[in-house]
Amino acid sequence: MQQEGGPVRSAPCRTGTLEGSRQGSPGHRKRASPKGSLSSAQPHSWMLTPSPLNSHCAHREPISSSPQPVANGPKQKKKSNWRSTTRLRIIRLRDRLEPRPLAILEDYADPFDVQETGEGSAGASGAPEKVPENDGYMEPYEAQKMMAEIRGSKETATQPLPLYDTPYEPEEDGATAEGEGAPWPRESRLPEDDERPPEEYDQPWEWKKERISKAFAVDIKVIKDLPWPPPVGQLDSSPSLPDGDRDISGPASPLPEPSLEDSSAQFEGPEKSCLSPGREEKGRLPPRLSAGNPKSAKPLSMEPSSPLGEWTDPALPLENQVWYHGAISRTDAENLLRLCKEASYLVRNSETSKNDFSLSLKSSQGFMHMKLSRTKEHKYVLGQNSPPFSSVPEIVHHYASRKLPIKGAEHMSLLYPVAIRTL
């Protein structure tokens, strides 16, 4: 039913809700809470528009302009809160279902690959290409290949990389650089131009012994003129032993087999010359040399730069040889050889066997000590591969002009004897 002059409201689906609010006596209105009175006095805006939840209710009732009595204040408040909450939920659901435009962020950073692709396209269109900074990042091989195709292969190699290194020897066809017609001047080292004998082809480093010996031929006087004191182990500091200490005592005992002494490879500094008996030792030789064989003065006139070793008289006894130092230790022998050049040698008594001798030699790798063993037939052999000799001077005389049969010294000979120093 409708009343004239009043607004129309939709009747709720739940019966008894509005009727209960209308019923009540004036005493009930007086005892109502202030909050309930205020909420009842205010116009119900949510009742003016039909709610989606109550759209199926077609019956409408007029709302009187006069204030309606409020019977239950708390219940009415709960109902209004429930309706407002339901309406907010519907609005939120509608907002979720409606499509929204995507927000584009201006500060988005593209990956490194995207930047490289953009620069490649800009370079192909004609704009100047920007060279990226070298930050240590390297593209994979496939990516580099694709980028090269995009850029159009601007940088092309003018000359392909050679697969092999340039040979050391120039071409033999006569064509040289800068259009010169003369062939390239060089010293031929081919086998047909080689001056060495066939048995020396396996030692290519030993070319021209004369040149090597002249290059390392430094006189001992240069060392003495230096302002600083002589180093430890110089020739002047070597002790001179009396003649009685060099005599070999005891009968000869047979040995099972000749053996090599252990060699010590100590790398030394630059090569220096050894004191030759033909220079300063000529006037200071022991007195026993003056009474010896006059042939012993022959090696004193030979030059140390000769490819052959200084001549040794094999008939002269061992005690009268200038390169025999008697009973000195291995350390003293190395100190004597330290200032001498390569292929310098001396003979001393063996420290392990009193009937044997040791040959101390200076090589390019250090010092070598080889044993001169005595066999059952009272012969002497050098190492294990040399033929037997009747005496030690014969061994020195033989290998002064021949290669040593010792492993590690096959390319060497006994060239420069280390003479004895006397005070």
From Swiss-Prot:
Q: Where is the composition biased (Acidic residues)?
A: 192-203
**Domain named SH2: residues:** 323-418
Sorted keywords for this record are:
Apoptosis, Phosphoprotein, SH2 domain
Please name the InterPro entries in this protein's record: SH2, SH2_dom_sf, SH2_domain_adapters, SHF_SH2
In its record, the post-translational modification comment is:
May become phosphorylated upon binding to PDGFRA.
Q: Which GO terms describe its biological process?
A: apoptotic process
Disulfide feature: none
Per its UniProt entry, which superkingdom is the organism in? Eukaryota
Q: A Gene Ontology molecular-function term? A: phosphotyrosine residue binding
Pfam families for this protein: SH2
Region (Disordered) residue ranges read 1-87, 110-208, 225-312
- Other remarks on record? The sequence described in PubMed:11095946 is over-extended by 57 aa at the N-terminus due to the presence of an uncorrected 5' mismatch compared to the reference genome sequence.
Q: How does it assemble?
A: Interacts with phosphorylated 'Tyr-720' of PDGFRA via its SH2 domain.
Question: What is known about what this protein does?
Answer: Adapter protein which may play a role in the regulation of apoptosis in response to PDGF.
> What is the protein's given name?
SH2 domain-containing adapter protein F
| Organism the protein comes from | Homo sapiens (Human)
Q: Its gene? A: SHF
